Amino acid sequence: MAPKRQSAILPQPKKPRPAAAPKLEDKSASPGLPKGEKEQQEAIEHIDEVQNEIDRLNEQASEEILKVEQKYNKLRQPFFQKRSELIAKIPNFWVTTFVNHPQVSALLGEEDEEALHYLTRVEVTEFEDIKSGYRIDFYFDENPYFENKVLSKEFHLNESGDPSSKSTEIKWKSGKDLTKRSSQTQNKASRKRQHEEPESFFTWFTDHSDAGADELGEVIKDDIWPNPLQYYLVPDMDDEEGEAEDDDDDDEEEEGLEDIDEEGDEDEGEEDDDEDEGEEGEEDEGEDD
């Protein structure tokens, strides 16, 4: 199985550098300044100069890495398109992939899974300069839940480094809003102290509270999108558990048969001992006569 593609290190918003250590100008001008203190001040100034060179090289490296990533991002596009065309031939590919992913499956309720059975295509598009953000598109067939054919969510990073997001408004059909139903279900469950289902997967499209820490978006972009096949092919855990239980049952049956055989051997041994004792008794009676 092909390894997951690791995203290149992209330029991060510049963080203000800590203020340089105060120079001991007044003391250095004094002829009576201790030698050790003067050497320490000179070392601090030289460290600051070297650090400036390191920062300059880091910025240069980030720019070059970004250019390489932009180049290969364009080269990958035809292959992503070809992969999408092939995936379209496999029914329920994306819902299976999401259900098999441990982090995404934790966000899926039963009705979410039903709705995702109509999901036919997923696309992740990084903006041309890459560092400013990306968009995730979900394409759906006609379904009983909402009118939209495409649901999208975009993530942006402005020049100051502040993240933000925006998404498609979901046009729910009458009585089919899974986000409201999820909230009602959780309220009932909490009152009855029953197991609470996770918040609906579709609330992700309306949640813009912390775009900089959107785990689902990052999982889809960095983990699932580079190689969704690895999650589609994950063995069904229920099947594995069933096979394990069958193996345990077979082992128990074999152990039971072995116990029966051992008990049978012991019984036969006891019968042989009884027969030997009987024969010895008859011989003793004959000698007495």
Curated annotation (Swiss-Prot):
> In terms of one coarse class, where is the protein primarily found?
cytoplasm
Q: Which residues carry this modification: N6-acetyllysine?
A: 23, 67, 149, 171
Which residues constitute the cross-link Glycyl lysine isopeptide (Lys-Gly) (interchain with G-Cter in ubiquitin)? 153
One GO biological process this protein is involved in is:
negative regulation of DNA-templated transcription
Q: Where is this region: Disordered?
A: 1-45, 157-206, 235-289
Location within or outside the cell? Cytoplasm, Cytosol; Endoplasmic reticulum; Nucleus, Nucleoplasm
Stretches for region Earmuff domain: 78-224
Entry protein name: Protein SET
Protein species of origin = Mus musculus
